[in-house]
């Protein structure tokens, strides 16, 4: 395994930038490290557990070597909330101030042009297009109940774009923390990214890394989840279920291939 570093990063939010799109009603804030972060708050309309899901999903994915923005745990001071009139969320017909305290942040990618859409003609030329099969395996493992979300950034290595995988809030079925596995979830909307998946080897090295993922690493990642976000016993039960699912990822991928939503049109290999 050649994982990206897992870094426990507790930062302090210093400045408000702007609101972001999406069901969690995130906001972009600057932290005391000088970077901007897309921040989800404890009182987001989806679930408090979404913050833990983001930390777990991002950290596990980065440990697998996938291109995922660096996650952080941010402390949002009450003074920043009070001094930022736009730092609010809409719940039903009410407008509420975002909660202060510990929040989840995903480092904003600010280098070069950043897009949330590329046409099919450009997707196959994305520098790390093979990683779509790796994050697909990750999404099956963690039961991501949302469609795969991606942003594309200008590549520093060559002309073109690199995919950065974002939004793990609906892993473990969002706030439910169960695993309703179906073939309809976790697939990127533009199937051209899977056109070179011809067999199990196309999911390597990420599939083998999942199957051999150390339980000690899972515990270390989970240990950084703030107790304000989830009770310890409940979190530890989730970790045990995540670990138990490692051996089922091939089965879960095969179920998608056998479904009407099969995105792997060129896969001809039969055996696991």
What do the PLM-derived regions correspond to, one by one?
Residues 53-54, 63-66, 93-98, 129-133, ...:
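Glycine-rich loops and low-complexity Gly/Arg-rich segments
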Residues 70-76, 148-155, 256-260:
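Short alpha-helical "patches" and their helix-cap loops
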Residues 50, 127-131, 231:
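Aromatic-acidic/polar surface patches that form glycan- and anion
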Residues 115-154, 208:
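Conserved kinase catalytic-core helix
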Residues 57-60, 89-91, 122-128, 155, ...:
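Short, low-complexity, polar/charged sequence segments that are solvent-exposed and flexible
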Residues 2-118, 138-145, 161-162, 168-172, ...:
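Conserved ATP-binding subdomain of kinase catalytic cores across diverse folds
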Residues 156-272:
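C-terminal catalytic region of ATP-dependent kinase domains
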């Amino acid at each position: 395994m050649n994982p990206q570093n897992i870094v426990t990063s507790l930062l302090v939010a210093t400045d408000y930038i702007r609101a972001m799109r999406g069901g969690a009603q995130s906001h972009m804030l600057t932290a005391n490290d000088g970077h901007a972060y897309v921040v989800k708050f404890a009182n987001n309309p989806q679930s408090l557990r979404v913050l833990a899901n983001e930390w777990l999903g991002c950290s596990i994915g980065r440990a697998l070597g996938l291109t995922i923005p660096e996650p952080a745990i941010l402390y949002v001071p009450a003074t920043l909330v009070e001094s930022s009139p736009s730092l609010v969320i809409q719940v039903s017909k009410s407008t509420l101030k975002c909660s202060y305290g510990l929040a989840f942040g995903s480092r904003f990618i600010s280098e070069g042009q950043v897009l949330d859409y590329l046409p099919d003609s450009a997707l196959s030329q994305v520098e790390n297009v093979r990683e779509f099969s790796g994050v697909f395996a990750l999404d099956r493992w963690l039961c991501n109940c949302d469609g795969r979300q991606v942003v594309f950034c200008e590549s520093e290595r060559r002309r073109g774009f690199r995919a950065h995988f974002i939004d793990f809030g609906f892993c473990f079925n969002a706030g439910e923390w169960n695993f309703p596995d179906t073939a309809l979830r976790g697939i990127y909307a533009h199937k051209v990214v899977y056109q070179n998946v011809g067999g199990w080897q196309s999911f390597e090295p990420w599939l083998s890394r999942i199957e051999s993922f150390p339980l000690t690493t899972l515990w270390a990642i989970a240990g950084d989840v703030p107790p304000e976000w989830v009770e310890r016993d409940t979190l530890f039960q989730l970790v045990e279920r995540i670990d138990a699912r490692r051996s089922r990822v091939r089965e879960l991928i095969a179920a998608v291939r056998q479904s009407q939503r099969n995105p792997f049109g060129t896969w001809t290999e039969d055996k696991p």
